[in-house]
Design a protein with these regions (language model features):
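Hinge/cleft segment of the Venus flytrap/periplasmic-binding protein
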Residues: 11, 31, 169-170, 181-188, ...
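Short beta-strand elements in bilobed, periplasmic/extracellular small-molecule ligand-binding domains
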Residues: 59-72, 158-161, 183-201
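Hydrophobic alpha-helical
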Residues: 93-112, 178, 197-257
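Extracytoplasmic "Venus flytrap"
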Residues: 34-57, 61, 66-81, 97-101, ...
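Short, solvent-exposed amphipathic alpha-helices that sit
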Residues: 46-63, 141-145, 169-189, 203, ...
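Hydrophobic alpha-helical segments within soluble ligand-binding/sensing domains
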Residues: 79, 134-159, 173, 201-205, ...
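Flexible loop/hinge segments that line or gate small-molecule binding clefts
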Residues: 101-140, 148-151, 158, 252-260, ...
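Short, low-complexity disordered leader/linker segments with a strong preference
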Residues: 1-34, 59, 109-116, 321
């Protein structure tokens, strides 16, 4: 374990402040191993749930964590700055959810050269440097969303996708998993060109309204993460168009409310608390010199939920508010 000087701690605090100026951050824990977690976001309820899981596990393990993420899930440069600052603080391990699967590669090389183990989460990277990736099987989850969409609209009609990005592996997999299932299993469904809203609710709502205006006969719209799905719901509501089936991804209070009210048909929920827990568990294993024993991926699971099962205790346990 690394020994820190007073000067290093002061420098770390200053750097953390600089990162906070363009996003949000928090810290928790005591004097144990230091784990710096750089997320894809901070404000969405999903990321707050990941943070909660990481904090809970850090308390169990006697570790100390910092958790930060950019204000928007399109702020790749801000996230790179945060990762740079995290490496400068020389933590015992880093948890990283990449907004761009390629942009962080040089920094991951730097972390490796400084013997800082990296644990990827939510989105992997185009690198073998992370010892493991704790994440949902996003392709399988998106395929499940596609299956439910096809069933809900009777296997025919136009369907649109509003995806959070085309640079992170989660964005790519949630797009491709949905499209591939539809192409293989639903020949009667016409997929419209994919639109990208950056996970931003307002932008995704505007995109949705444009889709509806250009395709008044549209049957369904899929939103690939919390911000995208809520944006789709708002866009459908603001358009005044009835009869559009909305399928989302993630949960959060706004999506839960939309499903309970019938505006959204259903969604895939991940297990963000478990993701946070697994990041810290894996980091601690790496700090203890057992990183080579970690599996390549840690599948944290997913569930379909709708009005019929939303009150099931198993579903309630993985919904975040």
């Amino acid at each position: 374990m690394k020994i820190r000087s007073v000067g290093a701690v002061v420098a770390a605090m200053m750097l953390a402040g600089a990162a906070t100026a363009c996003g949000s951050s928090s810290s928790a824990g005591g004097d144990g191993p230091q784990i710096a977690i750089v997320s894809k976001g901070f404000q969405h309820e999903f990321w707050q749930a990941v943070k909660k899981g990481a904090e809970q596990e850090a308390d169990k393990e006697g570790a100390s964590i910092t958790f930060e993420g950019p204000a928007s899930e399109s702020d790749v440069e801000d996230q790179i700055d945060m990762l740079t600052n995290a490496i400068t603080r020389k933590p015992d391990a880093i948890g990283f959810a990449a907004l761009d699967s390629k942009a962080a590669a040089p920094l991951l090389e730097q972390a490796k050269s400084e013997d800082i183990p990296v644990i990827a989460f939510d989105s992997g990277v185009d690198s073998d440097i992370p010892l493991t990736t704790a994440a949902t099987d996003n392709k399988a989850a998106a395929a499940e969303a596609a299956k439910h969409m096809a069933d809900l609209i009777g296997g025919k009609g136009k369907v649109a996708l509003v995806v959070h990005d085309q640079t992170s592996l989660s964005g790519i997999d949630r797009r491709d998993g949905f499209i591939d299932w539809m192409k293989q299993n639903a020949p009667g469904i016409q997929l419209l060109p994919v639109q990208y809203g950056g996970g931003d609710q307002a932008k995704s709502a505007d995109i949705t309204k444009s889709i509806i205006q250009a395709n008044p006969d549209i049957k369904g719209i899929y939103g690939s993460n919390e911000g995208s799905a809520i944006g789709v719901v708002k866009g459908v509501q603001e358009s005044g168009k009835k009869g559009i089936t909305v399928v989302g991804f993630d949960s959060g209070q706004a999506q839960i409310d939309a499903i309970n009210s019938g505006v959204e048909a259903g969604a895939i929920t991940q297990n963000p608390i478990k993701i946070g827990e697994e990041v810290v568990k894996a980091a601690m294993q790496a700090i203890d010199g057992k990183g080579d024993d970690l599996p390549k991926t840690i599948d944290t699971g997913f569930y379909w939920y709708d009005k019929s099962n939303i009150d099931d205790p198993k579903i309630q346990a993985v919904l975040y508010h």
